[in-house]
Amino acid sequence: VLRLVGSEMCIRDSHIGVKPNIKSITSLLKESGYEVVLAGKSHVKPNKVFDWTHYFPKVNNRYLPLEKIDDYLKNVNKPFCLIIASDYPHGPFPKTDNYGKADIFKLPYDPNYVGNHKPGYYQNIQDDNDQLGKVLEMVDKYGHKESSMFIYASDHGLSGKWSLQEQGLRLPFVVRWPGKIMPNTTSETLLTLVDVLPT
């Protein structure tokens, strides 16, 4: 969902399709000769604005299509933008012994929610990290590392969708850009996702 920052005098949720004449990152990259690929979930519209060169849907309505991604990265021979949209860490939450109450440092108020959901929520985050790690291994394996920028971001933080509190505003944002950003660099710069395209 695209929010046109500054075009409204009040803050509201814009849960509508993007206007057809809006230039999206996908349309701009395609005009510049890139293939634009979506792998995973999709609930953006209309297709005229988000016009994918290829779309690889989720596997079993849940998992990233790693085999399709691997095949694409092995054979692609032109500039590309691969957008990976994971379902994680959304539920369902698996039962797991890998995480317990001691691992949860921001406890919700409902202790039953902590015991029944948060360990599975944390496990989903770990599973998401594992899947994305496999994609990075593919990027490296097929020789794309030095010519690729990898951006990882989320639409909100810890269970904070539609919130202007910390959990809605503080989100993960990780960039791997060989030759431009030194590994293990951290920044306190304030940014939003709308800063990515002009940057």
Give residue spans per PLM region.
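Active-site-proximal cap/lid insertion segments
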Residues: 44, 70-197
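Single conserved hydrophobic/aromatic residue that forms the stacking wall/gate
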Residues: 1-6, 10-11
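The substrate-binding groove and active-site-proximal loops of carbohydrate-active enzymes
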Residues: 12-19, 53-61, 111-127
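Acidic, His- and aromatic-enriched active-site or binding-groove loops in soluble protein domains
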Residues: 37, 53-73
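Short, structured active-site-proximal loop/turn typified by the sulfatase FGly-forming signature C/S-X-P-X-R
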Residues: 7-8, 26, 30-36, 180, ...
